[in-house]
Amino acid sequence: MKCYFTDHRGEQSPTDGTTLSLTSPESTEESVEVFWPGTIQREGSSPRPGPAIPREEGLYFAARDRGMRDWSSSPSSESSEYQSYSQYQSCCSCMCDEDNAAPQSVCAFYTHVQTVRGVAVAWETEAGFEPVTRKPRIHEAQFIKRQRWNGSSFEMASNTDMRWDLEACKSNCSPEPEDIDLLECCLQELREPPDWLVTTNYGVRCVACCRVLPSLDALLEHAQHGIREGFSCQIFFEEMLERRRAQGQAHDQQLEEEQSPSDNSECSRPQGEVLSAQQQEKQ
């Protein structure tokens, strides 16, 4: 019995055994037509080397492979989207909290100073104005606390907090680009030195940055809005207040511990006196 194989071009070739004829290069799928005497049977695809996988399963595995590749690259994008969303949420929550938060007051620490012979600086002590080698007399003045972003603490100096404030200050206070060039040309020769470079006979010195300011109002303005100049002393003042509060709590706790043994001794004294009186009566 002989079997005939026919390719897509319609050519027949008698064979003594089983022979496979491949399709033409133009075709995208391989198929073989097998003719037996008396019967005609068509097979969908020719066998390939390796395990036989049906067309539906091949499509399934290809889609699965493509999905796994997509999944392997998706976590980075999802994480970036999650980070941006979390940053947006934190920013919105901080803005809402900032609007709803009541203004708080903070103490600014300063000392009075004066110049000696126009060069040396003497600050105020308990005995009067003396050289800076002596212990100064520290004064306090309250100012409205600048609202900070949530998440900032004393241990982590809020660089992010300052960056947001600087950007907001630049967006609100910066003039137009054309006006900047005009001002630079006009004020190049008329520019005056900043007030903190001018030597004054009398002023107040900020304990945080050691800057001498002409008046107390200027000091409070510096303490509250110093972020406009690229730095802020408010974090230092908050840290000082926090440490003072912690020292006060430790001192109160120490006093309570000292008072508690004295109370116990006072309670034990009457009992000792009663016992001694009973012993004397027995004798």
UniProtKB/Swiss-Prot annotation:
Tree of life domain: Eukaryota
Record protein name field: Protein FAM170B
Family: Belongs to the FAM170 family.
Basic and acidic residues bias (residue ranges): 1-11
Function: Plays a role in fertilization through the acrosome reaction.
Pfam families with a match to the protein in the record: Spt46
Tissue-wise expression: Exclusively expressed in adult testis.
Subcellular location: Cytoplasmic vesicle, Secretory vesicle, Acrosome; Cytoplasmic vesicle, Secretory vesicle, Acrosome outer membrane
Assembly information from the UniProt record: Interacts with GOPC.
GO biological process, one term: fertilization
Organism for this UniProt entry: Homo sapiens
Region Disordered: start-end pairs: 1-58, 246-283
